[in-house]
From Swiss-Prot:
The entry's keywords: Mitochondrion, Ribonucleoprotein, Ribosomal protein, Transit peptide
Name of the protein described by the UniProt record: Large ribosomal subunit protein uL16m
Transit peptide residues according to the UniProt entry: 1-29
A GO term, aspect molecular function: rRNA binding
Xref: Pfam families: Ribosomal_L16
Family per record: Belongs to the universal ribosomal protein uL16 family.
GO biological process, one term: mitochondrial translation
Protein species of origin: Rattus norvegicus
Length: 251
């Protein structure tokens, strides 16, 4: 015969707080909740939504330009840090933004965001670089073709759209990643903390690197005659940028 053993009641620990006794539950029921953000210092502008971007620049005459692929090569020197918002879309490669990409970002973000508690701003200019095309069936020669459309060149590390307001990163991360996957170059959603962490991780990898055979050492010492296959740009950027592509794992 099994003996029915009755469970002893859970003990209650009593502590004295300012001449009053309070019964505390056992440790299994304790929870630590993070404080709710107040957003006291956040100000929402009057026009909180993304503005419409013109398809053609408002100039009297546009000069036809060569390709100038250096516009999308290497790291960006503009729009690399946050200005007003706390969340943004970070470009992880170079490429060109067409007018359709601007409309896709504007419509997707404006439909999602609450204009009373959120705002979004552009960090890249409107399309200004002319791209020429020739008609189908034309013979070769005859000079440069007519202007077909305009694009905006973007480099690696440039912030494209910036968001902020009375919201957290988890609320806008899904929409920003949804927009980033539709862009013509690699991109992802970042916040101020994640962007700083990315820069810190890159510096730590450079300081704590245990592999002595780095790209910079091999190229500087001209091992195996590699200098004849490299350009001065490769020596400056230490091989991290190959045209419009960015290789973050290379130290």
């Amino acid at each position: 015969m099994w003996r029915l053993l009755t469970r002893a009641p859970a003990p209650l620990w009593r502590m004295h707080f300012s001449d009053t006794w309070a019964a505390l539950p056992t440790s299994a029921g304790l929870k630590t909740l993070l404080p709710v953000p107040t957003f006291e210092n956040v100000s929402i502008p009057e026009r909180s939504k993304l503005k419409f971007v013109e398809r053609v620049p408002l100039v009297p005459k546009v000069r036809r330009e060569p390709k100038n692929l250096k516009d999308i090569r290497g790291p960006s020197a503009e729009a690399t840090d946050f200005t007003e918002g706390n969340f943004a879309i970070l470009a992880l490669g170079g490429g060109y933004l067409h007018w359709g990409h601007f409309e896709m970002m504007r419509l997707t973000i404006n439909r999602f965001m609450d204009p009373k508690n959120m705002f979004a701003i552009w960090r890249v200019p409107a399309p200004f670089k002319p791209i020429t095309r020739k008609g189908v069936g034309q013979r070769m020669g005859g000079g440069k073709g007519a202007i077909d459309h305009y694009v905006t060149p973007v480099k690696t590390g440039c912030l494209i759209v910036e968001m902020g307001g009375r919201c957290e990163f988890e609320e806008v991360k899904r929409v920003l990643n949804q927009v980033a996957h539709k862009l013509p170059f690699p991109a992802k959603a970042v916040s101020r903390k994640t962007l700083e962490k990315m820069h810190q991780n890159q510096k730590e990898r450079e300081l704590n690197n245990q592999n002595p055979w780095t790209f910079e050492r091999i190229a500087t010492a001209n091992m195996f005659g590699i200098r004849k296959f490299l350009s001065p740009y490769d020596l400056t950027q230490k091989g991290r940028y190959w045209g419009k592509f960015y290789m973050p794992k290379r130290v």
